[in-house]
Design a protein with these regions (language model features):
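Active-site metal-binding motif and surrounding structural segment of the metallo-beta-lactamase
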Residues: 32-78
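Structured catalytic core of nucleotide-sugar glycosyltransferases
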Residues: 6, 11-14, 57-58, 63, ...
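Conserved beta-strand hairpin/beta-sheet module of binuclear metal-dependent hydrolase folds
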Residues: 1-41, 121-135
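Sterically constrained small-residue positions within well-ordered secondary structures
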Residues: 8, 67, 114-116
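Metallo-beta-lactamase
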Residues: 78-129
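A generic structural signal for short beta-strands and their flanking turns/coil linkers
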Residues: 13, 22, 48-50, 72, ...
Length: 135
């Protein structure tokens, strides 16, 4: 399991997570050029990203989503409330509420969090005997 914070703060949040053969982003509040550059610094091509997990829909967590979808088309995981309040047309997405079992031997569950947004979630990623909580 590999974890790397690509950006954190009011100007944008984006985290890279690699589990087995799968490569994920948690949030994408940075523009495509910045995110691509940061991914390449850790030897990851943007097109290798399998999915993006959205914690909430504040701009500093989703600003780069539209362009990243256009360029790479990863699957987007978000709640129904997030999707309903997101002003983007997303075709490759999955709605979840509590547990996401989307990749072999990887269990992903969500934690409902309090924040001033229609919905906010943390994630727990479990693989083999390792786990990572992103809250």
């Amino acid at each position: 399991m590999k974890f790397c914070v690509l950006a954190s703060g009011s100007k944008g949040n984006c985290t890279y997570l690699e589990i087995g053969n799968y490569k994920f982003l948690i949030d994408i509040g940075t523009n495509f050029l910045y995110t691509s550059t940061k991914l390449k610094e850790i030897n990851v091509e943007p097109s290798e990203i399998n999915a993006i997990f959205i914690t909430h829909i504040h701009e500093d967590h989703i600003a780069g989503l539209k362009r990243f979808i256009k360029m790479c088309n990863p699957k987007i995981y978000l709640t129904k409330k997030m999707k309903d309040n997101l002003e983007l047309d997303i075709s490759n997405y999955e709605i979840y509420e509590e547990i996401i079992e989307c990749y072999e031997n990887i269990k992903i569950s969500t934690v409902k969090l309090s924040h001033d947004t229609p919905d906010c979630r943390g994630y727990i990623f479990e693989h083999e005997e390792k786990s990572l909580a992103y809250i």
